[in-house]
């Protein structure tokens, strides 16, 4: 488990390129037949990936010991979105088939969660966010057909994109975790511009569906002290509440956003005018 400490905005603005990457970038999300796990002190979110290839991968008691509990989800909820081939997730003996871009919410109290791929030639890639939970909500599968896509932006401003809200109150109940998937239309490069912050939530972006020769310049920092982190395919970045989170790519891309914090009101954000950015 890779533990990341919280960081003050006044400290963050003094960091060089490598310093910013050390604090906020999750460089390796998927490793064959293993789970990766980054624990952030910011709202206690855990971020990572699970890619079973030649065997199943389970997450249970061994992780619990690192969290000071008996098992991983004793006091946590889990959100998973599969960006790879078809797979299965077994929760408490019940097996869920999770296809490409299907998702599974796992409620607090699930003692063991087992991940598997259907075809080793095209393994599943389970990206997950995990947050503290105060009560148990039912485990539920969510498919792309069950989300309500919202298309925003314009080709003229190069930010035409479709937002798919997987784990939001309109779809299912969670304690605090919200997750969704945003896909840019071909030829569009910008996400979340004009940008915003949200004082009551932190957020993690996971960029994927990118060619090897492509990258995204992820914008972060306070609106008057912006910085950037260069992101490549299948990498994640942690965004504190005080930071903007936006990006521009060399080609179109897709990203998963996950938020935890005080509320789940999607529109509870502090907008920043482009003219006010520095």
Curated annotation (Swiss-Prot):
Binds 1 zinc ion per subunit. The gene is kduI. This is 4-deoxy-L-threo-5-hexosulose-uronate ketol-isomerase. Belongs to the KduI family. It comes from Escherichia coli O127:H6 (strain E2348/69 / EPEC). One of its GO terms (biological process) is D-galacturonate catabolic process. Homohexamer. Catalyzes the isomerization of 5-dehydro-4-deoxy-D-glucuronate to 3-deoxy-D-glycero-2,5-hexodiulosonate. Pfam families: KduI. It catalyses: 5-dehydro-4-deoxy-D-glucuronate = 3-deoxy-D-glycero-2,5-hexodiulosonate. Its EC number is 5.3.1.17. Its cofactor is Zn(2+). GO terms for molecular function: 4-deoxy-L-threo-5-hexosulose-uronate ketol-isomerase activity; zinc ion binding. Pathway: Glycan metabolism; pectin degradation; 2-dehydro-3-deoxy-D-gluconate from pectin: step 4/5. InterPro entries: KduI, KduI/IolB_isomerase, KduI_N, RmlC-like_jellyroll, RmlC_Cupin_sf.
